[in-house]
């Protein structure tokens, strides 16, 4: 059995601080190659996700890694000891990126040839897995695998003229097949994960499977509680699929540093591992790596890599139904507030610092994200915008839990163990003064402000969550939030931008 990575370094632009080695505030181009190397060598992460989705991708990354750091990659073999995994555009959704999908897939055999030349022998394929975002149907997975086999590998046997074949011009094409990791990003797909993963296993009979569950985008689209419960439901179902088909499933989860996006950081990783039992691989995003002390980061990653993997937590049918109902109730309270705040969120998001060179995606779940009737920014800047105006998104919609029965509460607390811990971590950054300033500056509907106040009141009076923070961190963040909103009201954009960055540094993540 191959090694399955336990940590995956990603290019999510959630870092407030810029790493010392970066040539500019926006990490791009050659800096991302350096970043990939440092993820392996300095942080000792098992896997790097190379993102070809929504940005200018460098498909020559393997060539650059092998030529710039030959001694390291002779010791640590790509595809055996450490891994580089492409996140490809989904050609079904992202029309403008269809050819980028093709280009990225075509680069896989090139990486094989480079490794063959580098080692002077038949190598382990350095790249053999791809992540398919927004997977909603098992046939999409089969189509990607067949595309690689039919359109890329089989063309070596195409006859060009007389006895000259494609293989005679470009050589043999390897690897002959690849593996695919579905990335499940929407709530409906998580609740029907059997129809995606189960049907794929029935059709393709893989020896094992890695399944990637999003945690960040579902939070933005459906609210914190709905996102956590959707992932818990999906993990439970993956455990049942594993038993049913007798193949090992290795789940990945995409988690950021702040509670809304996963709460996975060097100070809280142990609780997150305990929360999401059965998960094999956790993402190590940019804020995790660059917004904490270096020794804290390295020690945390070492512990994550060395940990025991816990068993899946399986639910009975009634518990599954209750999770589904709570998720629906929560979302129906959360979404109208977000729709009403969309204008404010989009305006603030424009002034948060950019940390990656990204192209904008268009579409249902592209990088301009749609929830209900409005378009929102990326999840990172969405989260950062709400923190910046003193309304951590973790608390939006929370008063809907008042409708739960005692039994439903018990199921919720059993399946979201650290709910109060996460809410308390977020509630430190609530600022009533900023909420008042926001109301004045953008003329936000009074009814929406009332709903937000009901959520904060419920958190404080029913859940015993302390709102605001009397220590220096929370007070400083609240003060700077007010200053930022005053600067925006007066049209002092540069001043506001500096305040927004300062707040991000205080909370150790952009969003």
UniProtKB/Swiss-Prot annotation:
This is Phosphoenolpyruvate carboxylase. Its cofactor is Mg(2+). It comes from the Archaea. Keywords: Carbon dioxide fixation, Lyase, Magnesium. It holds the Pfam family PEPcase_2. Belongs to the PEPCase type 2 family. Its EC number is 4.1.1.31. GO terms for biological process: carbon fixation; oxaloacetate metabolic process; tricarboxylic acid cycle. Catalyzes the irreversible beta-carboxylation of phosphoenolpyruvate (PEP) to form oxaloacetate (OAA), a four-carbon dicarboxylic acid source for the tricarboxylic acid cycle. The gene is ppcA. NCBIfam families: PEPCase_arch. Homotetramer. It is an enzyme of class 4 (lyase). GO terms for molecular function: magnesium ion binding; phosphoenolpyruvate carboxylase activity. It catalyses: oxaloacetate + phosphate = phosphoenolpyruvate + hydrogencarbonate.
């Amino acid at each position: 059995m191959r090694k399955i990575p336990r940590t995956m370094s990603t290019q999510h632009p959630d870092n407030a601080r810029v790493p010392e080695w970066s040539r500019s505030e926006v990490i791009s181009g050659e800096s991302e190659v350096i970043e990939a190397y440092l993820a392996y060598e300095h942080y000792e992460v098992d896997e790097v996700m190379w993102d070809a989705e929504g940005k200018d991708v460098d498909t020559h990354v393997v060539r650059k890694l092998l030529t710039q750091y030959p001694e390291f990659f002779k010791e640590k073999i790509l595809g055996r000891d450490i891994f580089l995994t492409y996140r490809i555009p989904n050609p079904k959704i992202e029309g403008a990126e269809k050819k980028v999908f093709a280009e990225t897939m075509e680069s896989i055999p090139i990486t094989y040839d480079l490794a063959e030349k580098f080692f002077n022998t038949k190598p382990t394929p350095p790249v053999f897995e791809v992540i398919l975002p927004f997977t909603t149907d098992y046939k999409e997975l089969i189509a990607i695998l067949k595309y690689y086999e039919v359109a890329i590998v089989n063309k070596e046997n195409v006859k060009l003229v007389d006895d000259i074949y494609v293989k005679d011009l470009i050589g043999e094409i390897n690897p002959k097949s690849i593996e695919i990791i579905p990335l499940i990003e929407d709530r409906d797909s998580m609740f029907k994960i059997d129809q995606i993963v189960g049907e794929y296993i029935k059709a393709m009979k893989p020896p094992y499977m890695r399944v990637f569950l999003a945690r960040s985008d579902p939070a933005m689209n459906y609210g914190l509680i709905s996102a956590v419960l959707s992932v818990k439901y999906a993990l439970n179902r993956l455990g049942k699929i594993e038993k049913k088909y007798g193949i090992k499933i290795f789940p990945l989860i995409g988690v950021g540093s702040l509670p809304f996006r996963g709460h996975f950081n060097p100070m809280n990783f142990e609780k997150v591992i305990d929360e999401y039992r059965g998960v094999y691989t956790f993402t190590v995003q940019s804020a995790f790596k660059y917004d904490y002390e270096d020794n804290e980061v390295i020690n945390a990653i070492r512990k994550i890599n060395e940990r025991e993997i816990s068993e899946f937590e399986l639910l009975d049918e009634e518990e599954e139904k209750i999770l589904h109902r709570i998720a629906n109730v929560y979302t129906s309270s959360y979404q109208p507030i977000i729709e009403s705040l969309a204008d404010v969120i989009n305006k603030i998001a424009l002034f948060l610092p950019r940390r990656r060179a990204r192209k904008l995606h268009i579409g249902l779940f592209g990088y301009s994200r749609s929830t209900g009737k409005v378009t929102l920014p990326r999840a990172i800047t969405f989260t950062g915008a709400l923190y910046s105006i003193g309304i951590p998104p973790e608390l939006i919609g929370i008063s809907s839990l008042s409708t739960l029965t005692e039994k439903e509460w018990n199921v919720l607390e059993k399946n979201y163990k650290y709910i109060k811990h996460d809410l308390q971590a977020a509630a430190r950054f609530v600022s009533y003064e900023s909420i008042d300033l926001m109301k004045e500056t953008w003329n936000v509907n009074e009814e929406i402000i009332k709903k937000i106040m009901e959520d904060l009141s419920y958190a404080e009076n029913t859940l015993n969550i302390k709102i605001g923070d009397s220590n220096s961190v929370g007070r400083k963040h609240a003060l700077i939030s007010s200053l930022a909103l005053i600067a925006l009201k007066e049209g002092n954009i540069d001043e506001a931008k500096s305040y927004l960055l300062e707040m991000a540094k205080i909370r150790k993540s952009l969003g």
